[in-house]
């Protein structure tokens, strides 16, 4: 009966449920967008109740489209936007504040305060991450410090924290009626609180942040049965057996299981993950050290990650804020109407610059404008910004690993854009490879869940599912590639040193 696995993909802009068959093919999908809440400049929030309601809806939608019931589903996997922090009351099931999203920069003052003693890399050796607004830890502290009564309730043991994986899991397994409060190692590695070696919360760091340990979910592997769906839900009694943060899930879905393998996901942001195997590699080039995956009792696999805050969301900004396009695919048509970028470069530092710079004082800049520049040049510069940022991250990966990547596996929504993929190959100087199933994030979560219940027997079986769809070879002459890179790097410097006491 159990011929399928369902993955819940709780992303930055939408929540989806995708049903996969044994060959890793998509059977059906349910998807709902949720509201992006911007209370003030630099603040980004989601409504946790809306996310949970949408999750329930999309599960129903995916099942009904394929005419399936819970009896057809072997296991549930969860993947999620990482670092987005939810704090809720375990007695009522209600969030005490909106989810603070990974792009949110309101916690910069907390980062600055904590960095006074030991600098931004104060905890990096232990947790693999620099102090930055990006990670969950500063967001939890902000909620405890700023929401009336939150600290007292947390210290009394009434509040729970989770990234959205833990929020969805807790609700799926019963919520106030016995909900399981668990996260996996990949999500835990994005909080600033997990020791990379012990895979446990670090009490000393929790104390420094003023976060009670009672709030934190238990840390489990990425592939094991955490609990079963509550009897009040459509999927009742189905095991929930896989959790991976979205970028780690995409790496797993790309079958990048071996050291030296890597993928780049093109979504709201861009995230390049390079598998370092069982070795913890500390970056000297602005990358994060993170968990790749941990399967049950097996040893964990670690990874280096280059996180880019703004790529796909730059196209959304052209659509929603500027009204330059009415749908995201239009950007490719506009860009195709011009021969090159017309000397225009966009540095989309809306949340500062992430890897490899980690500059919170940067803000977005469009440089090289002349009267010659038109909408097509702006559209092309927006697409090229994604490729340039990826090149800088790949350079950092090559420097840290000492082993230059020979090709880049890609996935995510933007890989449908063929002009971007060709330019990406041109600016990297290595082939870019797209798999047949580009929903690798959901697929990775499905794989983790399916492995735990024996739906798939081993990693070899998963690797056999991976198939190439298309490959782009670099075509740009080396000297032109270098000229464009120099201009890009010059543009990046123009975005820095913007935020100071005059900038509200």
UniProtKB/Swiss-Prot annotation:
The lineage of its organism: Bacteria, Bacillati, Actinomycetota, Actinomycetes, Micrococcales. One of its GO terms (cellular component) is cytosol. Inhibited by fructose 1,6-bisphosphate (FBP). InterPro entries: ATPase_NBD, Carb_kinase_FGGY, Carb_kinase_FGGY_CS, FGGY_C, FGGY_N, Glycerol_kin. Gene3D superfamilies: 3.30.420.40. Sn-glycerol 3-phosphate binds at residues 12, 82-83, 134, 246. The keyword Kinase applies. Key enzyme in the regulation of glycerol uptake and metabolism. Catalyzes the phosphorylation of glycerol to yield sn-glycerol 3-phosphate. NCBIfam families: glycerol_kin (TIGR01311), PRK00047.1 (NF000756). GO terms for molecular function: ATP binding; glycerol kinase activity. PROSITE patterns: FGGY_KINASES_1 (PS00933), FGGY_KINASES_2 (PS00445). Glycerol binds at residues 82-83, 134, 246-247. Keywords: ATP-binding, Glycerol metabolism, Kinase, Nucleotide-binding, Transferase. Belongs to the FGGY kinase family. One of its GO terms (biological process) is glycerol-3-phosphate metabolic process. It comes from Paenarthrobacter aurescens (strain TC1). It catalyses: glycerol + ATP = sn-glycerol 3-phosphate + ADP + H(+). The keyword Zinc does not apply. Pathway: Polyol metabolism; glycerol degradation via glycerol kinase pathway; sn-glycerol 3-phosphate from glycerol: step 1/1. This is Glycerol kinase. It comes from the Bacteria. Pfam families: FGGY_C, FGGY_N.
């Amino acid at each position: 009966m159990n011929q399928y696995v369902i993955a819940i993909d709780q992303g930055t802009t939408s929540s989806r449920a995708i049903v996969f068959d044994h060959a890793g093919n998509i059977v059906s999908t349910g998807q709902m967008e949720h509201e992006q809440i911007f209370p003030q400049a630099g603040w980004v929030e989601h409504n946790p109740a809306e996310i949970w309601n949408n999750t329930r809806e999309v599960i129903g939608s995916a099942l009904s489209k394929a005419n399936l019931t819970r009896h057809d589903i072997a296991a549930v996997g969860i993947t999620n936007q990482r670092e987005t922090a939810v704090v809720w009351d375990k007695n009522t099931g209600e969030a005490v504040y909106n989810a603070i999203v990974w792009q949110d920069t309101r916690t910069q003052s907390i980062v600055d305060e904590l960095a006074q003693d030991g600098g931004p890399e104060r905890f990096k050796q232990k947790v693999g991450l620099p102090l930055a607004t990006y990670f969950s830890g500063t967001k939890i502290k902000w909620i405890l410090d700023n929401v009336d009564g939150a600290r007292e309730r947390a210290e009394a043991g009434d509040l729970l924290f989770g990234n959205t994986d833990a929020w969805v899991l807790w609700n799926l397994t019963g919520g106030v009626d016995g909900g399981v409060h668990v996260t996996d190692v990949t999500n835990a590695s994005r909080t600033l609180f997990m020791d990379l070696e012990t895979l446990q919360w670090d009490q000393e760091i929790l104390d420094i942040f003023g976060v009670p340990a009672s709030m934190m979910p238990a840390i489990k592997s990425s592939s094991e049965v955490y609990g079963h769906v509550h009897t009040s839900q459509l999927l009742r009694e189905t095991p929930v057996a896989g959790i991976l943060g979205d970028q780690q899930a995409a790496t797993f879905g790309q079958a990048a299981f071996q050291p030296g393998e890597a993928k780049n996901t093109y979504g709201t942001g861009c995230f390049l993950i390079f598998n370092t195997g069982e070795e913890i590699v500390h970056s000297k080039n602005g990358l994060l050290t993170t968990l790749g995956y941990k399967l049950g009792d097996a040893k964990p696999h670690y990874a280096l990650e280059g996180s880019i805050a703004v790529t796909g969301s730059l196209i959304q900004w052209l659509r929603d804020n500027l009204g330059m396009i009415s749908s995201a695919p239009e950007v490719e048509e506009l860009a195709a109407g011009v021969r090159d970028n017309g000397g225009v470069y966009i540095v989309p530092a809306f949340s500062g610059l992430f890897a490899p710079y980690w500059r919170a004082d940067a803000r977005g800049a469009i440089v090289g404008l002349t009267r010659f520049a038109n909408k097509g040049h702006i559209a092309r510069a927006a697409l090229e910004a994604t490729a340039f940022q990826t090149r800088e991250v790949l350079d950092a990966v090559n420097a840290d690993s000492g082993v230059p990547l020979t090709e880049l596996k890609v996935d995510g929504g933007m890989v449908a854009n063929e002009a971007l993929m060709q330019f990406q190959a041109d600016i990297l100087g290595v082939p870019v490879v797209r798999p047949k199933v580009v929903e690798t994030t959901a697929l990775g979560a499905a794989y983790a869940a399916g492995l735990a219940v024996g739906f798939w027997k081993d990693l070899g079986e998963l690797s056999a599912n991976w198939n190439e769809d298309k490959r782009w070879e670099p075509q740009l002459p080396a000297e032109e590639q270098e000229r464009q890179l120099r201009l890009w790097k010059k543009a990046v410097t123009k975005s820095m040193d913007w935020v100071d006491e005059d900038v509200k």
